[in-house]
Amino acid sequence: EITNLPECHLPFLQYIAVEAVGKPNGSWRRIAQGEGLRGWTIKTQNNIFGYSDWNINRPANAWYCTHLWQHYAYNNDLEYLRNIAFPVMQSTCKYWFDRLKENKDGKLVAPDEWSPEQGPWEDGVAYAQQLVWQLFNETLHAVEALKKVDIQIDNVFVSELADKFRKLDNGVSVGSWGQIKEWKEDKGKLDFQGNDHRHLSQLIALYPGNQISYHRDTLLADAAKVTLQSRGDMGTGWSRAWKIACWARLFDGDHAYRLLKSALSLSTLTVISMDNSKGGVYENLFDSHPPFQIDGNFGATAGIAEMLLQSNQGFIHLLPALPLAWSDGSVAGLRTEGDFTFTMKWNAGWLTQCSVLSGSGLKCRIYSPKGLIARVENSSGKRIPISLIKGGLIEFPTKKGE
């Protein structure tokens, strides 16, 4: 979505909708039924025919739903939200309504879950909690968007969703050495300083989620930084790509850039390896786990986009993680939530020019610490009034197609 290729996202979204709710006796629904639960869920590996295998990965149903919501957030297509995204999100919520249980602290937790790909199975693992939080939060936003245009939603469902969300453990807490805890109980396990495991499962809330941000909570963002520092900069190809995006979300462009260079280091190994030193790319720029895994290519591209433009906190942040190596430059065609397409130029690290194309005619809210926006004009050169929200955050009206 951020690279302005939503048509490349749609086949995956349609696949999710068909397999999750379009087949009454589909394999994804049968997994949930086998557990005595409503809704659907999946395992780690899934093919184009809906076959799911290797290991149960229940929270991945919530992860899939983040894609469904993201497409709406970028396109504002209410028919898509009503007919494709929301039915899947609602079904997924019902799965978790049935599965969550109350912990001794009174919070709702996902029982017997894993932190991919290490450690014990236990209740309230950060990976599961953060994804269920994201699911419930985005489904509530979907309900709000549909109700604004008088689309009727089951009130019993909405009430239960709000109640479960209020009681849910959000999966984000700080541990004994200042890290985001990977497991609910801080007993050491594998959650020790210096563990350089390739996965960042406890940082789903940083990226691709939006629960951790310096715009929200400095303490939690600092803890995410401690966690990333502990994991180190090495990793499989896709792991390095994930770290690029995470450092971009923490507004550290120089660190993200170092990881980008690392992700582009030459790899020659073509057999399966979990050695963190073997990741990179092959001579044809295919990502090397090793062997080839395309998520590293997609992830690195997404990370670069995150360095230049972010919109995950309800406003658009221009040049949030610009590295010193890119002090002068330009970019065209990147897209944000709210259906805005941006062209930007900068010099010596400061924004010098910015144009915005509004795809839906919504109000545009921008945060630009890398350059003061003193004047906004429409395509005819007429000045548009700016509202100053707070702390460098501005808002102005837009017209669809301009």
Describe each region flagged by the PLM.
Residues 1-21, 46, 53, 57-75, ...:
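Active-site core of glycosidic bond-cleaving carbohydrate-active enzymes
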Residues 22-41:
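Surface-exposed loop and adjacent secondary-structure segments within mature catalytic domains
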Residues 37-49, 135, 139-147, 151, ...:
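Mature extracytoplasmic enzyme cores
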Residues 75, 83-95:
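Serine-hydrolase-like catalytic core of hydrolytic proteins
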Residues 90-145:
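Acidic/histidine-rich catalytic neighborhood
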Residues 113, 161-169, 319-326:
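A glycine-rich phosphate-binding loop feature that marks nucleotide/adenosyl-phosphate handling sites
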